Amino acid sequence: MRKLNIWAILLVAIVALASCTQAQQAEKKQIAEHVIYIGLDGWGSYSVDKADMPNVKALMAEGCWTLQKRAVLPSSSGVNWASMFMGACPELHGYTTWDSSKHEIPERVILKNNIFPTMFQLLRDAQPEAEIGCLYEWDGIKYVVDTLSTNYHAQTPKGKEYTDELCKMSVQYIKEKKPVLGAFIFDNPDHVGHDAGHDTPEYYANLKELDGYIGEIIQATKDAGIYEKCIFIVTSDHGGIEHGHGGKTLEEINTPFIIAGKGIKKGGEMQVSMMQFDCAPTVLEIFGLEGPQVWVGRPMLEVFE
């Protein structure tokens, strides 16, 4: 009789645990209606303390941040933007170099659109009517975004006369379309880092200029009437040292990740470890979604209220 009672108790406990798990899954809700995702190519964490970036530092003060998000190796653009958007390491998504325009290793999984699953694709599947856009300066971005899952993607014209063009295009897009997910990827301070050098007066002058653009993008959400419904993310693919990157120094692999807005704690510096491929799962968490099994990234749950 005693054994039967024990088994009965265990059965009740198992059923209760299963019910709780199902309830937790059912309660997973969207945290914010809009995500504004801003990327600065070549922005190393080493520069943040010294940089004159009042808009970025206001986001840091109002939200959560880490200066120890690590890039995947090599610490170059294509492979890291891919890892950021695809929630996985190069061995899985197959993009392995700075200028990858297609996979060099066969993708472990392709769900649709002939590309490894991206955060854009998974949001599109969950919200077929959502406005999703990606605007960028470097043409390599279009190869890792899954443009078929966006409503709008566009590259800015090239040339010094178009320095502020991405900012203008981003502001117009936000005001007109109020994107559910809008990604705006600047190709600086990377160029300045290559030309004048990292950790130079020219590099910091460029960061100040980029911070002004970030301020205009934030203002655009206010003008569009969506500011209170937004989460803002500002991050980078890699840093740099002297005139380059691609190596293993902390100056090259430590990148900022800053998140603020609706439903985000005013928590200051994050205490958890973060990798490049944790960005996409964190974005999906905002929309109440989970990544596919093939993703290795984890959502940064610490940042949410």
Question: Predicted regions span which residues?
Answer:
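Bacterial N-terminal signal peptides that target proteins for export
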Residues: 1-9
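C-terminal motif of bacterial Sec signal peptides marking the signal peptidase cleavage site
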Residues: 18-19
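Active-site nucleophile/metal-coordination loop of metallo-enzymes that catalyze phosphate/sulfate
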Residues: 27-32, 44-125
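Structural recognition of the beta-strand scaffold that forms the well-ordered cores
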Residues: 35-39, 66-70, 83-85, 122, ...
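Metal-dependent active-site segment of extracytoplasmic phospho-/sulfohydrolases and closely related
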Residues: 36-37, 55, 209-250, 283
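Substrate-binding rim/cap in mid-to-C-terminal beta-strand-loop elements of soluble/periplasmic
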Residues: 85, 248-290, 301
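Catalytic-site neighborhoods of secreted/periplasmic enzymes
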Residues: 93-97, 105, 111-162
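Active-site His/acidic residue clusters
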Residues: 139-154, 168-212, 216
